[in-house]
Amino acid sequence: HWKDGIGPKENRKKMINTHWGGVVEDNSFGTHEFFELCRQLGCKTYVNGNVGSGTVQEMSEWVEYMTFEGVSPMADLRKKNGHEKAWKVDYFGVGNENWGCGGNMTPEYYGNLYRRYQTYVRHYQDSAPIQKICGGPNAGDDNWTKKVLETCFASPAPEDAHGFMDGLSMHYYTVPGESWMNKGFATEFTTDGWYQALGKALHMDDLIKKHGAILDQYDPEKKIGLIVDEWGNWHEVEPGTNPGFLYQQNTMRDALVAAVTLNIFNKHCDRVKMACIAQLINVLQSVILTEGEKMILTPTYHIFHMYKYHQDAELLRSDLTGVDTIQNGEFSIPALQESVSVQKDGTITVTLANLSAEQSYPVEIALTEKKNRTVSAKILTGAMNAHNTFEEPDAVKEESFEGVAEKDGTLSLEIPACSVICLRIS
């Protein structure tokens, strides 16, 4: 409840975090601290409201507290707590995982609650309307998607309300092991475990197509974004750590999962409007691990760093031909996978992943326009379980790749096994 996390820290309520670790939650990181972090990072804000155990009034008052500039009880309380100016809320999630830990609701029940709660997520700033995110499915639960959309689009509703939502969330985790009860460890796995993780990660493409097809029935103009706001590898925790803290190491296997998933998101950017890996620091597929004052960057961090050029760029159509298929149990895995975009200045970014744990492949990249070009490349590669530690923080890091040749508008290279290459063509 958000009011437990405002005001002087010494006066904030303490509670037991029954979901994660059974430790005392002192609410020292609340609304003000969250917005200060976003200010320092220079990132947009995505706030999630409590539908499972909170009231409509509580949610409405929180939005007022955060975004109303004038005189009102909640705006006055914000000012009393030290922040005169209202914040900007870019995205507001109305509930979280209400099919499970957020209330074990049926989709019809949640859909009606969503319609009610979102009504009171007011737009107090005309120049910065809040984008409302409806709680969508867990992985492949298309019944949830169908029933929630059916409920939200039912009459009475304004014709231009598009279901009272700007986005529909979806959660999907890659569990490399046999089941949730036997997920397998981050650093100890076989080649089968490598391909099992990649095969499950590639399933993201099927999920986006499945839920996207349902969205198309209600929203053919694609005004509603699919918000994949929890994704990534979920391993067993590192031995000796609190099971509720979800602390896990991060290897080249995680890097490849991130790479192929981001390539999938790129290719579905007409529907996927946001995607948030879970989570940034010390939890699940992190980009940063810390130990006291020390911090290290994970292989997944380097993938994000290499892929950053795709952001705010325009997708270019790309196809791979003559690619081997790796058969591993139930999984048929393409040996190579890619996505391509172009920035406003004309620079093309190609991100290419080799999903094979053992074999390198020659690649030719045919460019449709024959021009004089400058090509630079970075590579992230290593043994399939290679990872960074506090003793060896740079065991896995992106490096320059000099193995690109150009002739008559065609680029050629050999991509090593277990690697990701980012090409920049300008």
Question: Where are the regions a protein language model picked out?
Answer:
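Carbohydrate-binding surface patches
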Residues: 332-371, 377, 382, 421-422
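Noncatalytic carbohydrate-binding groove/subsite architecture in carbohydrate-active enzymes
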Residues: 107-259, 321-331
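Structural recognition of the beta-strand scaffold that forms the well-ordered cores
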Residues: 45-48, 90-94, 131-134, 166-170, ...
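Conserved, mostly hydrophobic/aromatic
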Residues: 38, 62, 92, 168, ...
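Aromatic-lined substrate-binding rim segments of carbohydrate-active enzymes
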Residues: 1-68, 110-129
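Acidic, Ser/Thr/Pro-rich beta/coil linker or hinge segments at domain junctions
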Residues: 371-411
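Aromatic/acidic polysaccharide-binding cleft in carbohydrate-active enzymes
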Residues: 172, 223-338
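Aromatic- and acidic-residue-enriched carbohydrate-binding clefts of CAZyme catalytic domains
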Residues: 1-31, 72-100, 176-193
